[in-house]
């Protein structure tokens, strides 16, 4: 049962916290933590990160006048406590559900979410944009970016920090170090020093000292500068950030409410240069099962609040992710040139399994997709067989490198694109909807999509065998169909699809895991007296043009089905048919794609039904192409 929350019950907006004492803020933080745990136990989601920033969230909304003052959360999966405090408590148990709250910050959801998030390292750049707009308008509000140490492995964060000093003198960056990867706080002395260097008296003395130093002879002046930097770096660890033009404060204990409130008040009106506050937090703080878990319960399904035991579904067939990893391990056992690269997602992509088998051939480059792609290009250029395992949505971050460093040079980098299609609870920011279009546009690219886990095994083998150009294969989140996978699947013939069912009236050409729904749609058509051919294209590029032309000759209509946006597989098929004159004889065609909107989170099956990509939707597409507006198909040729 949820603990009593007397203070939280009085909060309708962050303004209600601004008269609270520090003691009351501590109690409020405890209540927000309990509320967060209770909510996520019902919805599932990202738990550990949010628990780690409860005190910081309360302190930020207490010290700053949000939403006038802008707070931008990097990634956003730590923002559940923020949502509880900003008028969304009554809907917090709809997190990541259909029609409910997003699992990330979202502009359309609240004025307290000034900038949407989900991909890493965007916060400082966005904050600088807000700062420049504020300065241009002559306004005086604060702008705060909260970024984790994990996101600081992404180059975009440093690009923004490098530009900060030339953009504005008034920006606050809070570095949420929840992995103790930069520097731990050193007890009470650390908190004292952080408060000291953020205070006005220290800054005045330091400014006076700099003025005096500037009047000294050059050799003495340079020595004095270096000594000051060295001494300050020894005490605070902030020399690197100072070199970027920031005033560094920290590290401080991110769970010490007294220190947080004091330091944030000190830096609130700092306008000499951008300031970075280094806050050290503990992921999963305040919930024993999270504190004791290896991953700090970063992402969870529904769980029991008392024990922390997650209510995981009964084990089913292996996931597509696991099948990919297992197949790659098989090939690596007989081919020592195979290398695997991930951008901070080893468990999400299955490369944690590959890494256990072949640690010396596994590279986690951090949140650095651009580097991952060009690093793989370098490996390929020197004879290795690199596999970049990456979520489709994150490959977007490295697309220029795919074009410039891989495709133009025709280097045999293999892209394993996980989370293709719709992903459910994580919504539009994590959906893999565009890769067919942007990868299929590249000359020389071999682009495949697996219909099931056996096909995925064949595609891994195919990618291993392709050594004269780049290749990519896509597969969805979730479990396979439970099919038996060969010991070592054979490579596919490049650019050749397969006919799964022969028919006469309409040809349904599927790419990817919609094949099962296409077969169901064929059954529905058969029940209406219509005979359907079902084909698995396998390749979006190069297309099996011979198969497509044959289907065009022998059928009244062709329906293409894909788990992607317009401009992908269906567009490629239309282009091929038009080029070969197959549309000149009255062929009827429909391309079934995801709708031209960013679909909000829901269960994947419901999302595909909304998109018209389930069996009923495919049936409707086929009947429309055939000019049938009712359920009767009497008289149609069978």
Swiss-Prot record:
GO terms for biological process: 1-deoxy-D-xylulose 5-phosphate biosynthetic process; glyceraldehyde-3-phosphate metabolic process; terpenoid biosynthetic process; thiamine biosynthetic process. Homodimer. Its EC number is 2.2.1.7. The keyword Cell division does not apply. Its cofactor is Mg(2+); thiamine diphosphate. It comes from Caulobacter sp. (strain K31). Pathway: Metabolic intermediate biosynthesis; 1-deoxy-D-xylulose 5-phosphate biosynthesis; 1-deoxy-D-xylulose 5-phosphate from D-glyceraldehyde 3-phosphate and pyruvate: step 1/1. Binds 1 Mg(2+) ion per subunit. SUPFAM superfamilies: Thiamin diphosphate-binding fold (THDP-binding) (SSF52518), TK C-terminal domain-like (SSF52922). It comes from the Bacteria. Pfam families: DXP_synthase_N, Transket_pyr, Transketolase_C. Catalyzes the acyloin condensation reaction between C atoms 2 and 3 of pyruvate and glyceraldehyde 3-phosphate to yield 1-deoxy-D-xylulose-5-phosphate (DXP). Belongs to the transketolase family. DXPS subfamily. Mg(2+) binds at residues 149, 178. InterPro entries: Dxylulose-5-P_synthase, THDP-binding, Transketo_C/PFOR_II, Transketolase-like_Pyr-bd, Transketolase_C, Transketolase_CS. It is an enzyme of class 2 (transferase). The keyword Magnesium applies. Disulfide bonds: none annotated. Transmembrane segments: none annotated. GO terms for molecular function: 1-deoxy-D-xylulose-5-phosphate synthase activity; magnesium ion binding; thiamine pyrophosphate binding. Gene3D superfamilies: 3.40.50.920, 3.40.50.970. Keywords: Isoprene biosynthesis, Magnesium, Metal-binding, Thiamine biosynthesis, Thiamine pyrophosphate, Transferase. This is 1-deoxy-D-xylulose-5-phosphate synthase. Thiamine diphosphate binds at residues 77, 118-120, 150-151, 178, 287, 369.
